[in-house]
Amino acid sequence: MNPLILIILLTTLILGTMMVVTSSHWLLAWIGFEMNMMAFIPIMMKNPTPRATEASTKYLLTQATASALLMMAVIINLMHSGQWTITKLFNPTASTLMTVALAIKLGLAPFHFWVPEVTQGIPLTTGLILLTWQKLAPLSILYQISPSINLHLMLIMSLLSILMGGWGGLNQTQLRKIMAYSSIAHMGWMTAILLYNPTLTLLNLLIYITMTFTMFMLFIQNSTTTTLSLSQTWNKMPVITTLTMLTLLSMGGLPPLSGFMPKWMIIQELTKNDMLIVPTFMAITALLNLYFYMRLTYSTALTLFPSTNNMKMKWQFNSTKRTPLLPTAIVISTMLLPLTPMLSILL
């Protein structure tokens, strides 16, 4: 793709998201969503392979459906209240339709089926954008309309997302699909606490984006897309392999790494609100995620696949491209747990 066209598309993508995040009018938010979608689809087809075309088509169909539902909810709300303001969503039907539309855009269960397939069909860099930047716009709208969202509907979708995110990733060998199912589970944790403590959702989002960015950057450094290829990097880049292992365990929520902090704070907040069954279910289903991350860690750093003698440790390691953001991202992804007491006071 022409670099100039790519810059224009990325600028439009950023502007579309910023328009959604900063607008208080439904029409401007809808236009922002459409700008974002129409800029992202050509980026997905940067390498015009059949898989990329299929992924782009699936993404277009799901996002167009979600946008149609969103506009339908806005029109119903407009007919009942005469309001275009985002925060004034009073009609229950409009609120339910809006929640479903945003759940489709986020990839929450039971509308999650498109996320693994689309992520698998696109390159790692585009997958990183899909699983991080593309979550900002729908979550910002959910944050604004959180007082009028149906609690039971949101909790059911959140719990289903955590369950499906763990369940779906169990038998995967493709790293992009594993990251997609992990994204579904993390979205479930974020939306579960949204109605009780929206600020905690933002903290969880920040940590999730940092961990996902770190993970994808490590995959890009290693040029790996499968479990097998990841397990064969120890003799070329031992330091990168070790960091990959730590980040994987952090994404699974294993203490004392950063990924444990948002889970701990969310369970604590739900318990304060006299909810016991929901956080118990969330903690148990989070073990599914932790299991497949630990299995991935085990196959990456602690075992050797059957191989030839050429797989022995090399005397000279591959030189890696300098990425200034990666060390900072790794520190945030693994060492934030000591800040928990301070953050719990602030939140």
Swiss-Prot record:
It is an enzyme of class 7 (translocase). It comes from the Eukaryota. One of its GO terms (biological process) is mitochondrial electron transport, NADH to ubiquinone. The chain crosses the membrane at residues 1-21, 25-45, 59-79, 96-116, 122-142, 149-169, 178-198, 200-220, 237-257, 274-294, 325-345. InterPro entries: Complex_I_Subunit_2, NADH_DH_su2_C, NADH_UbQ_OxRdtase_chain2, ND/Mrp_TM. One of its GO terms (molecular function) is NADH dehydrogenase (ubiquinone) activity. Core subunit of the mitochondrial membrane respiratory chain NADH dehydrogenase (Complex I) which catalyzes electron transfer from NADH through the respiratory chain, using ubiquinone as an electron acceptor. Essential for the catalytic activity and assembly of complex I. This is NADH-ubiquinone oxidoreductase chain 2.
